[in-house]
């Protein structure tokens, strides 16, 4: 099971069930549409639609793109960001679906976000490039508690300390790092699979701030879940845990078998000694 937490001041939430959605399609998490709007058939609408088409067409090539369409006052700024652990086909499917739905759900809204479990798409009448943004945030997390929950937050924090310095524009997928580690503790062992990702328009300092914010969001809102996926406007944090079965005890660790003495054998009662001569015959 999963639960979703969202924070969206200055935005209202618009939810649409996709009647055509199948299991192979990306999972829609939430859509946020701004209150301010534009008029139908305006230059802003034309630029918005061109922007969304541009994002859709480019998503088969890269995991991230930002774009600017049109002249002031009708300029539209937009971007998409796909999770780095999915392939370009899945990225393209997600962005194309998101672009259609954001235009449908936020028909005349000047600003909008749409979050899927594999990507996010947004557009705005105000430039947002190179800036850290904390809202809106979406968190999907497991209702199961993390293994060794008393120590898990520290374990995850330490893992972030290790991964964040490795976020770099020179990686195969820019600003994306993933890791798998086996954690062994007295309470038991588990595999911790982690991924962090920043929008490439962020500098390293703002990337670190964004990832720390994402971690703080899940650790304060949701207890100690065994898995979580956090989307912010500029970064993604995901982790999962897989508990390992307890190993069977080795023979050397089994308690020794205590020797037991066998009960004494019981002998049959002693027979009377044999007669020295046969008894006389009976008289008739």
From Swiss-Prot:
Pfam family, one: Stress-antifung
Phylogenetic classification of the source organism: Eukaryota, Viridiplantae, Streptophyta, Embryophyta, Tracheophyta
Annotated segments matching region Disordered: 247-284
Gene: CRRSP7
InterPro entries (alphabetical): GNK2 (IPR002902), GNK2_sf (IPR038408)
Gene Ontology CC: extracellular region
The family this protein is said to belong to: Belongs to the cysteine-rich repeat secretory protein family.
Location of this chain's protein in the cell: Secreted
Organism field: Arabidopsis thaliana
Protein name: Putative cysteine-rich repeat secretory protein 7
Keywords: Repeat, Secreted, Signal
N-terminal signal peptide: 1-24
Positions of the Gnk2-homologous domain: 26-128, 134-244
